[in-house]
Amino acid sequence: MKPAGGRGGWGWGGGKGGSKGGDTGSGTKGGFGARTRGSSGGGRGRGRGGGGGGGGGGGDRQRRGGPGKNKNRRKKGITVSVEPHRHEGVFIYRGAEDALVTLNMVPGVSVYGEKRVTVMENGEKQEYRTWNPFRSKLAAAILGGVDQIHIKPKSKVLYLGAASGTTVSHVSDIIGPDGLVYAVEFSHRAGRDLVNVAKKRTNIIPVLEDARHPLKYRMLIGMVDVIFADVAQPDQSRIVALNAHTFLRNGGHFLISIKANCIDSTASAEAVFASEVRKLQQENLKPQEQLTLEPYERDHAVVVGVYRPPPKSK
């Protein structure tokens, strides 16, 4: 028995195969002609059930970029939420990708091009800013598991080495409108960016001075609860100590980011960190915690401690 339809005889198998080819754009079930004849503009074979015709439809779909059966499939919705971190004022965003975030003090405004996310909470929209640990030593320390940062809502913070205000802006979010962050930066170029950030954030007070000379800006700054230092200078322990003696209350806390190469490029990072800790201890700055910042920063460590701790009660 010869196939019906002469050259289009690959449609043997009836109309079922041809119609499948036309619907799905593949024509694989019983419609071999749908792929070979149809995709080359065929349809000349008339098969017993119109297999060749179904093939023509399949060829069309392929030219438009593939099977059409997934064309209108909707993407599954992703549930997003924000959870409080154990550090007060810091949050974790749960979505397509998890991220460290802070509640944006100035909704609708980003500081350094960071992503902003909006979440409905109790019927109100709340905007959060993602905090990049590759651009912030404090964020890297938090994700690295630091036990305490001592920066929380209503805190007064002295930030040494504020640069253009990337981390300062997140500290501003954490402490809220009732807190204050004094941001000290010596570079005038970075200082201009810092001032622009402070124009929209009323809890940031920019101080364009050298952190080595705290007496030059002592009239601008009151006593603070926390000092954060990211100055990357060979004498940074001395810089922190001078500012602590001038502005940090007894029992206050400090966080210092240490970049080993900036202090001694010939010694190992561990030796540099140990040396800096000894210098801090000589200045009534008692280190309580130390952690490295890998994988976010290489040869960096953050030391957290207390200044002139009160005597332990017996």
Curated annotation (Swiss-Prot):
SMART domains: Fibrillarin. Residues 1-59 have a biased composition (Gly residues). S-adenosyl-L-methionine binds at residues 166-167, 185-186, 210-211, 230-233. S-adenosyl-L-methionine-dependent RNA methyltransferase that catalyzes 2'-hydroxyl ribose methylation in RNAs. Functions as part of box C/D small nucleolar ribonucleoprotein (snoRNP) complexes, where guide snoRNAs ensure methylation specificity through base pairing with RNA substrates. Exhibits broad substrate specificity, methylating multiple sites on ribosomal RNAs (rRNAs) and messenger RNAs (mRNAs) depending on the guide snoRNA incorporated in the complex. Its EC number is 2.1.1.-. PROSITE patterns: FIBRILLARIN. It comes from the Eukaryota. Belongs to the methyltransferase superfamily. Fibrillarin family. GO terms for biological process: blastocyst hatching; methylation; mRNA stabilization; rRNA processing. It is an enzyme of class 2 (transferase). This is RNA 2'-O-methyltransferase FBLL1. Residues 64-77 have a biased composition (Basic residues). The modification Omega-N-methylarginine is found at residue 7. The keyword S-adenosyl-L-methionine applies. It is found in: Nucleus, Nucleolus. GO terms for cellular component: box C/D methylation guide snoRNP complex; fibrillar center; nucleolus; nucleoplasm. InterPro entries: Fibrillarin, Fibrillarin_CS, SAM-dependent_MTases_sf. The lineage of its organism: Eukaryota, Metazoa, Chordata, Craniata, Vertebrata. Keywords: Methylation, Methyltransferase, Nucleus, Ribonucleoprotein, RNA-binding, rRNA processing, S-adenosyl-L-methionine, Transferase.
